[in-house]
């Protein structure tokens, strides 16, 4: 008889604790110090980061956070907490939250599950498409947490779910709901968070996952390549990142006759600064200034019922397939 108790740890990237320059600086410092994210020589990168990038970017980014901040706090944290609550209710088992950077820490999430008697932990990084910059960074934090622990709990870590049928179904449903509310646009653009092209050249499978997700979503929606496409946003620095860039794609669509655009970001499980400000506001401005007439931002899956059902299915399959 198996008397082991299973718990679930949902993990996302993280967020500043407040929309202030100080809080944003602290968060960005931790995030951009991770070699999984920026692998530049430390003797070059650290002085550049602390002497130039953080002093300039932190106040600017803080103002952007202020524009999307919710009454309950950071959107990413608010939606992540709702996901935890909904998944816990659906599974009737302990579910905790951890962030790779910032609060709540992955460490505190694991400790919470252990305090509830969990000796088996299923770790679900909320990154549908695997990347060294996201999923692998979660693994690093887990390994760091247990570096000096004599007896490890049983871990199962979800690698990706870019082609999970319920994930694709949830994405398609969110697009259809947008069509019902706002009308159907001429084109659906799937905008994924970008990573340096060099990472993919060195073996990261992120781009392949993004392409497959887009392909499956197109099939689910019954759209042709003339009606749906993909691009990459949030480029940072001068290095070449995955292309096509979202900003350049938006400039090219209207001149091709696409005047009404629906835009979605399948790589984000919860709405955050990159979706609520960059995708919803900045990208809209680019499209409209380039000749577009209608721009519809489709929110992330957040705590949508189908999204929670997908998480529950992933967890349940790991429990009952053992």
Swiss-Prot record:
Biochemical pathway: Porphyrin-containing compound metabolism; protoheme biosynthesis; protoheme from protoporphyrin-IX: step 1/1
Residues the entry annotates as binding Fe cation: 193, 274
PROSITE patterns: FERROCHELATASE
EC assignment: 4.98.1.1
Compartments reported by the entry: Cytoplasm
Reaction equations catalysed: heme b + 2 H(+) = protoporphyrin IX + Fe(2+)
Location, primary (coarse class): cytoplasm
Top class in the EC scheme: lyase
GO biological process, one term: heme biosynthetic process
Keywords for the protein's UniProt record, in alphabetical order: Cytoplasm, Heme biosynthesis, Iron, Lyase, Metal-binding, Porphyrin biosynthesis
One GO MF term: metal ion binding
Keyword set includes Lyase: yes
Superkingdom field: Bacteria
Gene Ontology CC annotations of this record: cytoplasm
SUPFAM superfamilies associated with the record: Chelatase (SSF53800)
Pfam families: Ferrochelatase
Cited function: Catalyzes the ferrous insertion into protoporphyrin IX.
Family, as annotated: Belongs to the ferrochelatase family.
Protein's name in the database: Ferrochelatase
UniProt organism field: Aliivibrio fischeri (strain ATCC 700601 / ES114)
Gene name per UniProt: hemH
